Amino acid sequence: MVRVSTSEFRVGLRVEIDGQPYVILQNDFVKPGKGQAFNRIKVKNFLTGRVIEKTFKSGESIETADVREQQMRLLYTDQEGATFMDDETFEQELIFWDKLENIRQWLLEDTVYTLVRYNGDVISVEPPIFMELSIAETAPGVRGDTASGRVLKPATTNTGAKIMVPIFIEEGEVVKVDTRTGSYESRVSK
């Protein structure tokens, strides 16, 4: 892959450190009064999710990681995993459940997901940032709930995600949900 110098370090840059793919989360350039300047970076491992700090002397270079993203549509799920299709080439690919555990609650058929690949192999699947989901189950809002300061109630979406929604949301309504935090954003339809 391509080598990048410390002067090219940017947040979001994908690099390879000790044979592992990382993404730069934070980059601080430090020029002490005495001694050589250096970059202190905070990186997240794509495979393990662990965040570590590394220091590089000014002018050092490291390899970029062969991490690519591909947009694919979820066709269906079964006991083995989920089958995705590329909308342009119509190629289908089965992703096993072990790679989908952290997003299982966000799997919805006919939705486009981002498959992250490292050296050609899928290492993770990322859902869209916002999804429109229908409320499958929630308790009815009772008059007087807001008097006790309670303005949110638990709800379960059609994908099985458990979220907190305002008390005026009822079963069957469609809501917009932020998949990064699992929080309610807005009502889509009534």
From Swiss-Prot:
Molecular function (Gene Ontology), one example: translation elongation factor activity
Coiled coil (residue ranges): none
Keyword S-adenosyl-L-methionine: no
PROSITE patterns assigned: EFP
RNA-binding found in the keyword field: no
One CC-aspect GO term: cytoplasm
GO process annotations (BP): peptide biosynthetic process
Compartments where located: Cytoplasm
SMART domains in the cross-refs: EFP, Elong-fact-P_C
Keywords: Cytoplasm, Elongation factor, Protein biosynthesis
UniProt pathway: Protein biosynthesis; polypeptide chain elongation
SUPFAM superfamilies, per database record: Nucleic acid-binding proteins, Translation proteins SH3-like domain
InterPro entries named in the record: Elong-fact-P_C, NA-bd_OB-fold, Rib_uL2_dom2, Transl_elong_fac_P/YeiP, Transl_elong_KOW-like, Transl_elong_P/YeiP_cen, Transl_elong_P/YeiP_CS, Transl_elongation_fac_P
PANTHER family, per the entry: ELONGATION FACTOR P, ELONGATION FACTOR P (EF-P) FAMILY PROTEIN
HAMAP family: EF_P (MF_00141)
Function per UniProt: Involved in peptide bond synthesis. Stimulates efficient translation and peptide-bond synthesis on native or reconstituted 70S ribosomes in vitro. Probably functions indirectly by altering the affinity of the ribosome for aminoacyl-tRNA, thus increasing their reactivity as acceptors for peptidyl transferase.
Name the record gives this protein: Elongation factor P 2
